[in-house]
């Protein structure tokens, strides 16, 4: 049987030190980096996403950073398409794709594929846009909530692109997006039980985080404070100056940006904004840990250890990812 090419996943919660370890790995391995982060795809959103500096990116390029305008949406399906293309290009040049980031849904989409959603239907889309113009997007959101409350809970009424797509899927197929995803989950579970994967690579799964959760909480608070000192509020002011950006867009709903936006709207004091931003980031980290606890064949590394690079290399050698 032909051996599949290698790939490395470097996962972990926010503020755990993933980027630093990824760069150390690229210094000693023939790897190229692919970002797995739903916020880093956006241009002009640098401080609040803790995006690597321009100097660092020039020295250690990351695919899938700064590829979209904040007015655009980016789905797990979009990521899967882009990441597979990047992985194929890296592999074709004899290198190893090293995927680093904390958007766990993206990793899952790569490994398991995505629900087979119906193609876009221009006529249905035109009907939905006409209804929105006549009734308002809130009315369409109410329609979605009536048939697919799970999707409605995830999609903001001011996110017309995702709202239109969810209703389009239901009207075209007769099944909600939630039903499609549940069917895909059942297929993925069956594939996992039989050892099949939708990703044509031999994947080494690494995760890094402080063993002490309080240490991570301290890091999160320190980083959010540092972002504010670096000009995070001014960054959001610049985004707000654009007439095509609003609080319902996926980019602006990113952790931190949402809280600063509300502060600039007068909904939160400066202290409340900072507190809620830190809490939201901690909640994100908790969700990331929840994903990781169920991840198979995962090698954990402690962020505070000084020997993570040799430990990671030893693990990669043990599973023959480097042979």
UniProtKB/Swiss-Prot annotation:
This protein's source sits in the domain of life called Bacteria
- BP term (GO), one: tRNA modification
- The UniProt annotation puts the region (Interaction with substrate tRNA) at 37-40, 161-165
One family from Pfam that matches here is: IPPT
Q: Which reaction does it catalyse?
A: adenosine(37) in tRNA + dimethylallyl diphosphate = N(6)-dimethylallyladenosine(37) in tRNA + diphosphate
Record-annotated residues binding substrate? 14-19
Looking at the UniProt record, the site noted as Interaction with substrate tRNA sits at: 103, 125
Q: Which UniProt keywords apply?
A: ATP-binding, Magnesium, Nucleotide-binding, Transferase, tRNA processing
Keyword Nucleotide-binding in the entry? The reply is: yes
Required co-factor?
A: Mg(2+)
Q: EC number(s) for this protein?
A: 2.5.1.75
Keyword Nucleotide-binding belongs to the record: yes
Report TM segments.
none
GO MF term set? ATP binding; tRNA dimethylallyltransferase activity
Binding of ATP: at which residues?
Answer: 12-19
Q: What class of enzyme is it?
A: transferase
Q: What does this protein do?
A: Catalyzes the transfer of a dimethylallyl group onto the adenine at position 37 in tRNAs that read codons beginning with uridine, leading to the formation of N6-(dimethylallyl)adenosine (i(6)A).
Q: Which family does it belong to?
A: Belongs to the IPP transferase family.
PANTHER family cross-referenced by the UniProt entry: TRNA DIMETHYLALLYLTRANSFERASE
What assembly does the database describe for this protein? Monomer.
Write down what this protein is called.
Answer: tRNA dimethylallyltransferase
Gene label: miaA
């Amino acid at each position: 049987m032909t051996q599949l090419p290698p790939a490395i996943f470097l996962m972990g919660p926010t503020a755990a030190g993933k980027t630093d370890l990824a760069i150390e790995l690229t210094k000693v391995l023939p790897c190229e980096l692919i970002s797995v982060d739903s916020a880093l795809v956006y241009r002009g959103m640098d401080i609040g996403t803790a995006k690597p500096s321009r100097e660092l990116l020039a020295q250690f390029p990351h695919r899938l950073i700064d590829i979209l305008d904040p007015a655009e949406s980016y789905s797990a399906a979009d990521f899967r398409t882009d990441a597979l293309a990047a992985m194929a290009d890296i592999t074709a040049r004899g290198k190893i794709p090293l995927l680093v980031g904390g958007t766990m849904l993206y990793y899952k989409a790569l490994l398991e594929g995505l629900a087979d959603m119906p193609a876009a239907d221009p006529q249905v889309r035109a009907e939905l846009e006409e209804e929105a113009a006549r009734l308002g997007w809130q009315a369409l959101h109410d329609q979605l909530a009536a048939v697919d409350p799970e999707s409605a809970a995830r999609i903001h009424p001011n996110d017309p692109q995702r709202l239109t797509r969810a209703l389009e899927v239901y009207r075209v197929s007769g099944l909600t997006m939630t039903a499609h995803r549940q069917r895909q989950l059942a297929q993925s579970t069956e594939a996992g039980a039989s050892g099949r994967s939708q990703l044509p690579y031999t994947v080494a799964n690494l995760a890094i985080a402080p063993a002490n959760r309080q240490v991570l909480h301290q890091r999160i608070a320190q980083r959010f404070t540092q972002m504010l000192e670096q000009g995070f509020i001014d960054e959001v002011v610049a985004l707000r100056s654009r007439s095509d950006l609003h609080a319902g867009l996926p980019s602006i709903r990113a952790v931190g940006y949402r809280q600063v936006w509300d502060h600039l709207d007068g909904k939160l004091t400066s202290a409340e904004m900072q507190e809620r931003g830190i809490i939201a980031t901690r909640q994100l980290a908790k969700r990331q840990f929840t994903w990781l606890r169920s991840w198979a064949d995962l090698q954990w590394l402690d962020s505070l250890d000084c020997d993570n690079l040799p430990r990671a290399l030893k693990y990669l050698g043990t599973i023959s990812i480097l042979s």
